[in-house]
Amino acid sequence: MFNKISIKTFFKKFDYILLGLVLALTAIGVIAMPSVVDTMNSGPSILKTQMFSIALGLVLCLGFSIIDYSFLRYWGIVFYIIGLIMLIYVIPFGYGRDDPNIGSNSWIDLFGVFSFQPSELMKVAYMMFLPSQFELLKEEFSIKRLIFIAISGLLPIGLILLQPDLGTSTVFAFSFAVLIFVYGIKYRYLIISVAVLAASLPFVWLFLDTWQKNRIRVFIDPTFDPSGAGYQTSKSIVALGSGGLKGAGLFNGIQTQGNGIPVKESDFIFSSIGEEMGFIGCSAIVILAFLIIIRCIYIASKSHSYYGQFIVAGMAAMIAFHFIENIGMNIELMPVTGIPLPFISAGGTNLIGSFAMIGIIISASIRRDQIKRI
């Protein structure tokens, strides 16, 4: 479970750069959140959850960095199966579909004490398990294993679509595609995969609720339903445009303090930060996000094991897509899908899962010279 490295070696090889970038991004959220939720009745509760999730996330981050990441290949299948069970359970028994801010049965409530989103935890399990299978395929090609990987990769995506949660399913699909790319798929297989994906889009459309279809229509045509499905993005653009270079200042944003921005603590926190912290605040987020992903790519490229390359690349892809989608939907470059902004948005499960992935990536960085399996 623990690679035989000394405490001195651990601290010497610890990736302070990656952790520092993540903490800097988290700090922006900690600074902005009190202002963002100030006029919300649930504001105090959101802040408490945010602080608790960050603290727990940091503990998990440190814990996973201590554990030899290559050990996770043996437990990935266990966590993957548990994740599948939760994804199946949440479809009929979860909650959120009747909530206009959620729209899908994505959450499980535990005795009224706390709730969590299984798909967020599944992201970590997914990236523990699939890289181990790609590693085996890399070592010895097998049609049976290729089919097994295809089924294992697509099954969670299908279950999440049934909730229906288009945004999260897209995160999984993107990360799965990155794993295939890292593996080095032949072009003919890539063309076939793209063709199958394109052919499946009409079937995916059938599973979407009307409000999800309208969001896609608004993305294609911004003038479609500006007071309904297009309301969120229109308010987001207004907030960003009014922020200017330095912003209106914390607790001074008209849209943010007037509750003009829907889901401003999560999906549209980027626009709230843009209004109150301006172009400078938004630029800081984009730059830090870019540096985090670049650092992860560097770690993956330096790993001497296939598992290390796959697990870091896959987790980096998940985090990267969150950045791209969330910021993109805030500036009308992507359809609105309810994807949170990593390390900044309110949302305990996503925060905890994201920190856990960073911990695993740091573990891979510390042990990047490791080749043999434990």
What are these model-predicted stretches?
Residues 244-280, 307:
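Long extracytoplasmic/lumenal interhelical loops at the membrane interface
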Residues 1-3, 33, 326-374:
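A juxtamembrane structural motif centered on a specific transmembrane helix
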Residues 19-27, 31-35, 39-232, 271-331, ...:
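Hydrophobic alpha-helical transmembrane segments of multi-pass inner membrane proteins, especially
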